C-alpha cells in the first residue's frame, strides 16, 4: 500500500504540477488511488477536480427500491427495518437522476441497488435511461444473487457496454448465483462476484456517548468513499440514508443535500456538494454506528432475521 501511495503521489506531482500535495482534497485522492479505487487513466478527471472547478462524484449508490429478497440482520442499508418497502417509479427515478446530473460534471460509478434491484419490474427502463447519460462513466448493479433476471428486454439492457453486475455472494442464501453467472456468460454480460465471508456489525441504532474528537477519529477510520442517493437527497452513507427515511436517525439539513428541493442556484449547490464531500468531518449518524471504532465486531455472514422477530 505505501509503495502504491508513493507512486500515486509521484504521478500526481508530475501530472498536476500546480497543485500542492498538502491539498486536503488531493490527500483523499491519493488514498483513493492507493486503495485501488482509481487507476492512472483517471488522472485527467482529478486534474479537472483540483484545477478547473470540475465536480466529480467517484461513486454514488442509486437506490431504486427498499424491497429486498433477504432480511440480513447486519444489513448496512437497514433493509429489515422497512415494514412497508417501496419500489420507486421509473418516472421518479429519471427525474431524480436528471436533477443530480444538473449539478455534477461526472459520475465515475453509478451503483444501482436496493434492496434487491432485480426485484424492480422496470429495471431495464431505468438502465436504458441511465446509460444514455454522458456524465455517467459506468453503471454497476449490485445483487445478492437471489433473483434471476428472465425478461428479454432486461437481459438486452444488461449487455450494454457501460453496464456490469456485481454479485454479493452470501453463500447458500445466494441461491441463483451460479445461474446468474451462467446467464451472464451466455449473453456476454460483464459480471463479477464479491465474497466477504466475515461481516462486521455496525451495532444498534441507539445513540452512543462520544466526544467531537472521538467522532472525528471514528469518521476518519470509517473512511467511506461512496455516497448514497435516496429520494433526491445525497447522504454520506447508506446507513444514514435509510435511517433518516425510517425516522430512526435524525439528520440535520446540513448533514445531507436535498438536490430535488434546493433553493439555491446551480453554483451554490455545486459548492455545497463539493464542501459536503470533502470537508465533512463527521455526521450525527456516526453517534448511532460503530463502524470505525473498536466496538465494530465480526459477525456471521448474512445471518437472517426470523419472521416476526423484533429488531
Predicted feature residues:
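N-terminal amphipathic/basic-hydrophobic helices that include classical n-h-c signal peptides
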Residues: 1-6
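Conserved alpha-helical substructure of the radical SAM core
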Residues: 10-17, 21-141, 148-149, 308
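Short, charged low-complexity linear segments at domain edges
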Residues: 38-57, 195-207, 249-272
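Extracellular structured ligand-interaction cores
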Residues: 57-59, 162, 219, 283
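Short, flexible loop/turn elements at secondary-structure junctions
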Residues: 68, 116, 145, 169-171, ...
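Soluble or luminal CAZymes and related metallo-dependent hydrolases
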Residues: 88-92, 122, 176, 214, ...
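Conserved AdoMet/S-adenosylmethionine-binding subsite of the radical SAM
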Residues: 120-245
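Accessory C-terminal segments flanking Radical SAM cores
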Residues: 206-311
Amino acid at each position: 500500500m505505501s509503495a502504491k501511495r508513493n507512486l500515486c503521489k509521484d504521478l500526481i506531482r508530475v501530472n498536476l504540477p500546480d497543485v500542492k500535495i498538502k491539498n486536503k482534497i488531493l490527500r483523499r485522492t491519493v488514498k483513493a488511488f492507493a486503495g485501488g479505487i482509481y487507476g492512472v487513466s483517471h488522472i485527467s478527471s482529478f486534474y479537472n477536480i483540483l484545477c478547473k472547478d470540475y465536480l466529480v462524484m467517484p461513486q454514488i449508490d442509486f437506490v431504486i427500491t427498499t424491497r429486498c429478497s433477504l432480511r440480513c440482520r447486519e444489513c448496512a442499508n437497514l433493509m429489515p427495518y422497512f415494514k412497508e418497502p417501496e419500489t420507486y417509479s421509473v418516472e421518479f427515478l429519471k427525474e431524480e437522476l436528471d436533477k443530480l446530473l444538473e449539478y455534477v460534471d461526472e459520475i465515475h460509478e453509478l451503483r444501482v441497488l436496493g434492496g434487491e434491484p432485480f426485484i424492480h419490474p422496470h429495471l431495464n427502463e431505468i438502465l436504458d435511461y441511465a446509460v444514455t447519460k454522458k456524465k455517467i462513466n459506468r453503471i454497476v448493479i449490485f445483487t445478492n444473487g437471489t433473483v434471476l433476471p428472465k425478461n428479454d428486454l432486461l437481459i438486452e439492457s444488461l449487455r450494454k457496454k457501460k453496464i456490469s453486475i456485481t454479485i454479493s455472494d452470501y453463500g447458500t442464501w445466494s441461491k441463483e448465483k451460479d445461474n446468474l453467472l451462467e446467464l451472464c456468460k451466455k449473453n456476454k454480460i460483464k459480471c463479477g462476484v464479491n465474497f466477504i465471508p466475515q461481516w462486521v456489525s455496525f451495532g444498534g441504532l441507539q445513540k452512543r456517548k462520544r466526544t467531537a474528537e472521538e467522532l472525528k477519529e471514528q469518521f476518519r477510520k470509517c473512511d467511506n468513499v461512496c455516497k448514497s442517493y435516496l429520494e433526491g437527497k445525497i447522504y454520506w452513507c447508506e446507513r444514514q440514508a435509510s435511517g433518516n427515511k425510517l425516522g430512526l436517525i435524525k439528520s440535520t439539513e446540513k448533514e445531507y443535500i436535498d438536490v430535488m428541493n434546493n433553493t439555491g442556484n446551480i453554483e451554490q449547490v455545486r459548492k455545497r456538494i463539493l464542501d459536503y464531500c470533502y470537508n465533512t468531518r463527521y455526521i450525527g449518524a456516526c453517534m448511532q454506528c460503530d463502524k470505525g471504532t473498536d466496538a465494530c465486531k465480526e459477525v456471521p455472514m448474512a445471518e437472517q432475521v426470523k419472521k416476526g422477530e423484533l429488531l
